[in-house]
Amino acid sequence: MMRSSLGKSVRLRPVCTLLGLAVFASATAADAAVHRVHPGESIQAAIDTASPGDTIFVEPGTYQETGNAQFGLRISTDNLRVIGQVNEGQGEAGKVRLLQFGTQQTGVYAAPQGCGPELFVCADELQGFYIRGFTVEDFPKNGIQTRFVEDFQIIENESARNLENGLYPTLSTNGLVQNNISYGALDTALWVAGSESVRVIGNELFGSPTGLEITVANDVLATHNDIHDNTVGVGLYHPNAAGNPQRPVMANWVIEQNRIHNNNLPNPAPPGSFQAGLLPGFGVLLLGVSDHVVGKNDIEGNDSAGIAVVGWCTATSLGDPSRNCSNDPPQADPSANNNLIYLNKLSDNGLNPTPGIPGVDILYLQTPPFEAGVGNCFEKNKPASFTFLSSEPDGQLPTDGC
């Protein structure tokens, strides 16, 4: 652990993340072959003939793979690098586009052989996966998904209108998701679920119910992302909303130095889904989770609240009073505890709130005794005149964790 500039203890990602990526790079460099795919040829055929450590270069063009009824591309070979050779400045003609065909559900799925997306346990683990330069379009489930992968890199891809999740690292470890664009999902543009030691850097995420979502994960850093025009910009959600099993430790989600703005999209999620219950206008929504950091972000123009820290049962009962902690017990502690909210720059938030929501820069709501709300620290957010509403007895934002 280390201390932040404010003295708050902050756990850092394990150094094995960087070491793992270095080992991955060295492994792929030794005795590796290069495969090239041109328009009219099959990317999947090259994947199927590749050996661990090989690199596949794909020329610009539009590709529809017909060999797999479930996935556009299925990767189960260790340390494979799949690279789209984008020609900048040529628009659609310069992209490597992967389009949905037939009954395919997910665009790119990387996981060990025999371990499908319906499984929560796999006897094996895929070692190393790298994808760059793909535009994945119009799949009914996910754009690019990893599952049971150790050491993965998802870099400079575009996920367009993949209807559940755009980029979806699940049950995976030691990963980098960097400089991607993801939009048009009906769930989440980028969802880190059940994963550990993941860096999310420099992505643009927009046009979805949630821009960046983190659930049941451990050690996630999100920095220098541009998150805008979603229903909720950043969603840090309780295990009840996860759809994946809980990890032994689910802490240290660090949301720092991002631009989070204008997240006021009318919610496009299908009725009955968890996402359909999200109200528009929230920059960061921390919902019944603990031991996380939201700091040094520029948060502006979110109609309901710039940052909301809310207990799980409080949030669910706002929409349905019968869904309180007594009648609808949560899977885990519903409190938001031990969170650090510091040095965020807040402007023009809460100016056009959803009916029933008090429009403010910072909203803090928890309902004792089920939601104790201990150890939280709101410190040095600016300007000093930012607006807030707090359920604390003294009406102030909590500082007992500072």
Task: Name each model-derived stretch.
Residues M1-L12:
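N-terminal secretory signal peptides that target proteins for export/translocation
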Residues P14-S26:
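Bacterial N-terminal signal peptides
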Residues A33-E59, Q64:
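Acidic Gly/Asp/Thr-rich repetitive segments characteristic of extracellular carbohydrate-active
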Residues R36-P39, P60-Q70, T77-P140:
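Right-handed parallel beta-helix/beta-spiral solenoid domain characteristic of secreted/periplasmic
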Residues I43-A50, Q64-I75, V121, F148, ...:
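Short, T/G/N/S-enriched strand-turn elements that build extracellular solenoid repeat scaffolds
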Residues I47, G67-F71, G91-A93, F101-T106, ...:
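Short glycine/acidic-rich loop motifs that flank beta-strands on beta-rich extracellular proteins
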Residues E59-P60, N79-V86, D124-D138, E150-E164, ...:
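Right-handed parallel beta-helix
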Residues A315-G319, S326, Q331-P334, K345-C402:
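Acidic, glycine- and Ser/Thr-rich low-complexity intrinsically disordered tracts
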